[in-house]
Design a protein with these regions (language model features):
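Structured loop/turn residues at beta-strand edges in well-structured enzyme cores
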Residues: 7, 56, 105-106, 122, ...
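Short amphipathic alpha-helical segments
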Residues: 111, 125-126, 231-235
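Adenylate-forming
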Residues: 123-127, 190
Length: 236
């Protein structure tokens, strides 16, 4: 899909508050990062400033759902509608959150999730990427394993048809990949914890409700305004 192909120097809009992993991959790929300030109430994009920041050079808006709190995706989609702009999601802190009954991480072309040990579920290290774009799916599958073709279908969207020679395809590399495959133990931990995710999020929401009820009238505190249904990665 030519519309999803970026080149060095393309402009990506990001929120001014996030974890470093939101920014550094963009920098490493030579993309131009433009910071937009956050809304002090939601801690996500200040939507008026986001709209003002978009120019004809903008190719991507990267939405970060901070501390479990969804962005207002109705507003973001209205801002980028009819523009050649890709929406991506950093959903590493918001697994299980919803906006208009839709899971965060599924509004953009791709959504990333973290399973670091301090997150909603843990495989100690690791994460998940979701996409409904088959070409991106195949690219990601190859990138996670050195850029090889072993895990691609015979007819694929990255290279020519794979050979029936298993030896050849075992040592054929077509992308500048990484080695980020999970260990079986990590995968097993993740599979079991996903089963518990509804309970985990339910308990976080109960705890957050208690904090809100206890602290909402404190004159020195401003509590993060919930958009949609937060999964409460943290309380701020």
């Amino acid at each position: 899909n030519p519309k999803l192909r970026l080149k060095r120097g393309d402009e990506v809009i990001v929120p001014a508050v996030s974890w470093s992993t939101t920014y550094y991959p963009l920098y490493q790929y030579g993309l131009k990062i433009k910071f937009v300030d956050i809304d002090i109430e939601t801690l996500n994009y200040d939507l008026a400033q986001l709209e003002s920041a978009i120019t004809n050079k903008t190719r991507v808006v990267l939405a970060v759902n901070l501390l479990g709190n969804p962005n207002d995706f109705d507003c973001i989609n209205n801002i980028i509608r009819d523009k050649d702009i890709i929406l991506l999601e950093d959903n590493c802190e918001s697994m299980g959150a919803t906006f208009n009954n839709k899971k965060t991480g599924t509004f953009g072309v791709m959504g990333t999730f973290s399973s670091f040990y301090s997150h909603h579920i843990s495989t100690m290290e690791g994460g998940i990427i979701v996409t409904d774009d088959e070409e991106l799916n195949q690219i990601l599958t190859s990138l996670r394993s050195h850029g090889w073709t072993r895990d691609l279908p015979v007819k694929n969207l990255i290279c020519d048809d794979k050979s029936e020679d298993l030896l050849e395809e075992s040592f054929r590399f077509v992308l500048p990949g990484y080695n980020v495959r999970p260990l079986e133990l990590e995968g097993a931990l993740g599979v079991e914890q996903v089963k518990k995710l509804p309970m985990i999020i339910s308990e976080r929401r109960k705890n957050a409700k208690l904090f809100v009820e206890t602290l909402s009238n404190h004159s020195d505190l401003l509590i993060q305004k919930e958009v949609g249904m937060s999964s409460w990665f943290g309380f701020s």
